[in-house]
Amino acid sequence: MHASVKVLDIDIDMMTNDVFVQKMNEYLSDDKLDVILFASTELLDKAMGEESYREVIEQADLILPGEEALLSAHHVEVLEAGGMVVSCKSFGIMLENLQKKDQSVYIIGKSSTEVEQLETWCKRMQPGLRLSGSVVYDPDMEAAALINEINNHTPDILLVDLETGPQEIWIMEHLPLLHARLCVAIGGVVSLILAEEKEAPEWVKKLHLEPLYEKLVRQQSVKKDVQA
């Protein structure tokens, strides 16, 4: 199943996780660099107010729901129960189901902490994944130098975790120069992924309450994203 719904007048692609996994494996097997945006409420708000930015994000091959809050008017619980992509955590499902397990990933992040957490998360999702490199992005960084650094590693997957707005503009501006097969942007919703990397306190572990703790952490992350 692959359809779309209007959220704040933006077309959001809707598909099952099975279809998503199939598409990602297809993207990783062709020679074109495909761009996947996991959308946040902030991204959609910005696109509503800035036509030029809207034109930028509409260049993406897929705009997927990056957080469940986007689908609050579309019975998100039913969609999730039906195996639909409802947040950026489906990227983890994709990594788990890579046809070629030793794909390489290069990470561009906002901070060294987030880069390290994303590296840990990616390897947990797919132990066979090769971490080809990473960089903490600086707006003053020379674009040509960064692009050369990425291209020297020729990653299969370019995972981008930057601020909403600059992230999408940077990707689309430099898309023709990048040597990768798949670019996945998660900057506006990365907290949903990083929440899974927060280790439970010792007292929680002793009481064997890790699943409940992880659920509460995820819910708190969603609330923060909605309030933002």
Name the predicted role of every residue range.
Residues 1-83:
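N-terminal nucleotide/polyanion-binding subdomain common to many enzyme families
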Residues 36-38, 64, 157-161, 184:
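Structural motif
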Residues 41-43, 69, 162-166, 189:
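Short glycine-rich anion-binding loops that position phosphate/pyrophosphate groups of nucleotides
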Residues 53-59, 168-190:
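A short, gly/pro- and small-residue-rich
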Residues 70-143, 149, 153:
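Conserved beta-alpha
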Residues 137-141, 179-213:
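Short, flexible loop segments at boundaries between secondary-structure elements
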Residues 150, 154-164, 180:
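Proline-aspartate-enriched helix->loop->beta-strand connector
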Residues 212-228:
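A charged, well-structured terminal subsegment
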